[in-house]
């Protein structure tokens, strides 16, 4: 920040005006260089703070375009803006590289929640960088159009001078009229482009750090500071307290940058109700404030430099007035979350998480399963194909509430356990051999199909065990029903199954949420032999499925709960999904305990 040309100091009662120079600095450039020595760049990147209210009564940006273009000033502001945007891009590219390296180091020995949070931070920085690049392209496009209009305007101006010096004639007058019309059009276009570029300058966040006056400031002194930037105003009052402390009625203000316009600062000492002594008034340049890092500025208020105004000025390349405000936490995670919420609009080619519902990214048959969208159906998740698995087909295929073990099992939560048990008992015939069923001819729908495990009460007949060993599964069936009559091989409880295991996901394949859903719907079952061993009992079959149960169902449910945790408070769909997943986990534990008890009874 540099100081303007005029500075005012009060005169004494004898009319003597204090000298305008100090230590040989009498010219404008010398005074500017003297004040530039107080500009310091912060060594660390300061994260965005919570915004304060703006001067809404002054209008958003400039409602009117300037009447006269300022091409030289426009070029200076464009160069400063371009350098600031490039610096912003470099800073965030460095931050992105650091986060990416951190993700590579943590992805092998971290849990899903840590990786998911780090992936969200990386995605937020990437979206912010894409918006910066899009912003830079818009600025360049506007400046190129401005240069074209400037050349046309210069050409029209030279032609107007040439026709004015030529002999007067009717054709010359007509040509001069046409040239004047074109010159006016080009001038208006330049003013319009200046106004459009002014809307892309972002905002200056000015934070009050207090006055520094050495022995000049005494306890009890009161000061008024008035800042004017175009049509924007900021007036604040402060008092010097004991032990060098200062209290001000305002600490932070947001100014919208202007192409033509300097910041004017006036400091007044309040002596009484109607006694105000002007300490000094300065004008500050703003083109040096387009920087990625906060700048601590010390402005000389008087000519001797005995009173300085300390300000911390931070430039944000985007105007975030109408976006979601953030909290005042300045930690790294909070800053990244704020940035993600602030810049969630994105560019046209950059869709964000808020623009798409979580359920719209899933296949249509995951939740609807081919039925109409308006039909109420139980929520289910499909795990991978289990090619050589025994199944228990339903005894009554016309009954929609019945379910069976298949090669693509679903965990269904709609039907209650007493209804399922009643359905299974009614569908199972009360005969275990052809001799006991010779007198009664059952209905075709009551006949058990091949490979069916006949269940009576809580006991499994030998016929069911023999057919389990003889008949391989058919890959056409696709349901598993978590009830008391499910084979123990799918629900055998082990000590290892109660432990949570980290889920390995590839961070280079896109959104982790999509990978998690893909993990739930993909075939990730370890290969099994072509035919299950027949010499063992049902408990022997459970060994082949123990790893599948431990590594797929429990792991997937816990991983899904971790993935839903950050978003279930914001989206109602996630709250319902979280409740369904917890219900699934409870049913799985109850069913596992029930089947373990049944196995002991057998």
From Swiss-Prot:
The gene is RIPOR2. The keyword Ligase does not apply. Acts as an inhibitor of the small GTPase RHOA and plays several roles in the regulation of myoblast and hair cell differentiation, lymphocyte T proliferation and neutrophil polarization. Plays a role in fetal mononuclear myoblast differentiation by promoting filopodia and myotube formation. Maintains naive T lymphocytes in a quiescent state and prevents chemokine-induced T lymphocyte responses, such as cell adhesion, polarization and migration. Involved also in the regulation of neutrophil polarization, chemotaxis and adhesion. Residues 83-112 form a coiled coil. Homooligomer; homooligomerization is regulated by RHOC and leads to the formation of concatemers through the association of N- and C-termini. Interacts with NCAM. Belongs to the RIPOR family. InterPro entries: FAM65_N, RIPOR3. Residues 46-73, 384-474 are annotated as: Disordered. It is found in: Cytoplasm; Cytoplasm, Cytoskeleton; Cell projection, Filopodium; Apical cell membrane. Keywords: Cell adhesion, Cell membrane, Cell projection, Chemotaxis, Coiled coil, Cytoplasm, Cytoskeleton, Differentiation, Hearing, Membrane, Myogenesis, Signal transduction inhibitor. It comes from Gallus gallus. Residues 403-416 have a biased composition (Polar residues). Its main location: cytoplasm. Residues 48-59 have a biased composition (Basic residues). One of its GO terms (cellular component) is filopodium. Disulfide bonds: none annotated. Residues 173-421 are annotated as: Necessary for interaction with NCAM and myoblast protrusion formation. GO terms for molecular function: 14-3-3 protein binding. GO terms for biological process: cell adhesion; cell differentiation; cellular response to chemokine; chemotaxis; muscle organ development; negative regulation of cell adhesion; negative regulation of establishment of T cell polarity; negative regulation of protein localization to cell leading edge. The keyword Cytoplasm applies. It comes from the Eukaryota. This is Rho family-interacting cell polarization regulator 2. Residues 423-437 have a biased composition (Low complexity).
């Amino acid at each position: 920040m540099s100081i303007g040309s005029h500075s005012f100091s009060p005169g004494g009662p004898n009319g003597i005006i204090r000298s305008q120079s100090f230590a040989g600095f009498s010219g404008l450039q010398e005074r500017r260089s003297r004040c530039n020595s107080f500009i310091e760049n912060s060594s660390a990147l300061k994260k965005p703070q919570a915004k304060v209210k703006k001067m809404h009564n002054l209008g958003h940006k400039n409602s009117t375009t300037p009447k006269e273009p300022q091409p030289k000033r426009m070029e200076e502001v464009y160069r400063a803006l371009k350098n600031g945007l490039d610096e912003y891009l470099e800073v965030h590219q460095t931050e992105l590289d650091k986060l990416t390296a951190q993700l590579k180091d943590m992805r092998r020995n971290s849990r899903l929640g840590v990786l998911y949070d780090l992936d969200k931070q990386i995605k937020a920085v990437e979206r912010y960088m894409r918006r910066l690049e899009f912003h830079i392209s818009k600025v360049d496009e506007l400046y190129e159009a401005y240069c074209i209009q400037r050349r046309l305007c210069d050409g029209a101006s030279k032609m107007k001078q040439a026709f004015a010096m030529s002999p007067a004639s009717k054709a010359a007058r007509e040509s001069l009229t046409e040239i004047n019309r074109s010159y006016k059009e080009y001038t208006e276009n330049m003013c319009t482009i200046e106004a459009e570029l002014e809307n892309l300058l972002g905002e200056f966040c000015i934070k009050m750090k207090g006055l520094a006056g050495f022995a000049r400031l005494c306890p009890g002194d009161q000061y008024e500071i008035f800042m004017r930037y175009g049509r924007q105003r900021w007036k604040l009052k402060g008092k010097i307290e004991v032990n060098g402390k200062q209290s001000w009625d305002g600490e932070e203000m947001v100014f919208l940058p202007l192409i033509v316009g300097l910041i004017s600062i006036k400091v007044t000492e309040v002596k009484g109700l109607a006694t105000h002594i002007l300490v000094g008034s300065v004008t500050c340049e703003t083109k040096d404030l387009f920087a990625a890092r906060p700048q601590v500025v010390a402005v000389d208020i008087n000519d001797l430099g005995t009173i300085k105004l300390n300000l911390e000025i931070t430039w944000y390349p985007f105007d975030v007035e109408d976006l979601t405000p953030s909290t005042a936490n300045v930690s790294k995670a909070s800053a990244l979350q704020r940035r993600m919420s602030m810049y969630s609009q994105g560019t046209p080619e950059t869709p964000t998480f808020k623009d798409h519902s979580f359920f719209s990214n899933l296949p249509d048959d995951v939740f609807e399963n081919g039925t109409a969208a308006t039909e109420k159906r139980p929520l289910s998740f499909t795990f991978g194909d289990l090619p050589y698995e025994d199944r228990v087909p339903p005894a009554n295929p016309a009954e929609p509430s019945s379910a069976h073990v298949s090669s693509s099992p679903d965990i269904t939560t709609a039907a209650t356990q007493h209804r399922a048990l009643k359905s299974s008992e009614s569908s199972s015939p009360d005969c275990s051999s052809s001799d006991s069923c010779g007198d009664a001819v059952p209905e075709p729908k009551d006949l058990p199909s091949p490979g069916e495990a006949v269940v009576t009460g809580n006991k499994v007949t030998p016929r069911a065990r023999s057919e389990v060993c003889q008949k391989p599964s058919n890959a056409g069936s696709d349901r598993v029903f978590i009830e008391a009559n499910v084979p123990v091989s799918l629900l055998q409880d082990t000590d290892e199954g109660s432990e949570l295991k980290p889920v390995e996901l590839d961070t280079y394949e896109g959104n982790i949420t999509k990978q998690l859903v893909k993990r739930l719907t993909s075939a990730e079952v370890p290969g099994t032999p072509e035919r299950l061993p027949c010499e063992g009992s049902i408990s022997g079959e459970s060994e082949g499925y123990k790893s599948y149960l431990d590594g797929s169902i429990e792991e997937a449910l816990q991983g899904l709960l971790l993935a839903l945790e950050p978003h279930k408070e914001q989206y109602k769909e996630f709250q319902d999904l979280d409740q369904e997943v917890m219900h699934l986990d409870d049913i799985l534990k109850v069913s596992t305990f029930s089947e373990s008890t049944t196995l002991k009874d057998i």
